[in-house]
């Protein structure tokens, strides 16, 4: 696999996907990010409960896929690279390199086959909502989301779709 893209694009994708990657997992691949290069590049983070992927434009010289280091470390590495074109390459021997300007990092990658597949989203259950409306819903209910980790069921919001109406409920347990 080999591709090149603007640093800010890859950095944004890595930052987004890193939010879903597992910090500690018995499946070591879940601590990293799955990078897939084809017509563009997809960066995926997944912890078996939540998954985030982001597609970016890139010049793909050699299609392929691999799992690159821990998400946290990869995110930090992206932050330290100078602005410009980043080239990511993973050879058949699983040696990976990331180059940008005068900076170059080398490390070992894991095979993409080690990364569990994200469940497919059922498009029949999809909802389209404007960013402004969703932001308003979140702003009006976020205060009620619990931060108490001993009761994780209250650490999120419930979205219900009934008769074309989307309702969002947040509760902190009180």
Describe the residue ranges of each PLM region:
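Structural preference for solvent-exposed beta-strand-turn elements
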Residues: 1-174
